[in-house]
Amino acid sequence: MSVVVGGVEYSLNNWARYEIKRRAAELESVNYYPHCEYIMPEDVVVSILGSKPNCPFLEALKRFHDFLKKQRIIFKEGYLVIPWMGAQEVADMIHHVENRINLGHLEDLAHMLKLITYHRSFDTSINQSFENLYAFKFPDANIETHELNFVRQLEKKMYGYILRLEKLQTVLTFYIEFLLKQI
């Protein structure tokens, strides 16, 4: 299984490949996006939507750049940057669109936005888990049994994180599409 998160493909069966990409992504995010908690290259957005490059969706995003910036959704050097939204921002966003949408969809939107605001320390937890895992490098016969068990627990935890991030990515796509329909 593999999943693209923040423009990086995570493979549960190939830790070495993941490590290389993780370090590259860390350097990139630290150097260019120090305040952002979620970043996706445009081509990843395109692949999520099942569209081709230069699709109407991306063109619309660029066209309404100012509006999107107010919603903390911006492009930087070809990246779509989506910071996590706080509770007040969610309330403001719902208030902004509540008079323009079918009331039957409002509950669904609120539910989606609750998922987006899931947990601010989410990424931090993931990074710490992977760092703990890599402190053991690749397990071998010399490692104590309790350490191996700890590594397996971390792997299980990471599997859950990656599945939830995959779901979150779908939610974010829905959210952006929804915003565009309101403009």
Curated annotation (Swiss-Prot):
Induction: Expressed in the late phase of the viral replicative cycle.
Domain of life: Viruses
Keyword terms of this UniProt record: Late protein
Family stated for the protein in its record: Belongs to the asfivirus S183L family.
Name this polypeptide is given: Uncharacterized protein S183L
Gene source species: African swine fever virus (isolate Tick/Malawi/Lil 20-1/1983) (ASFV)
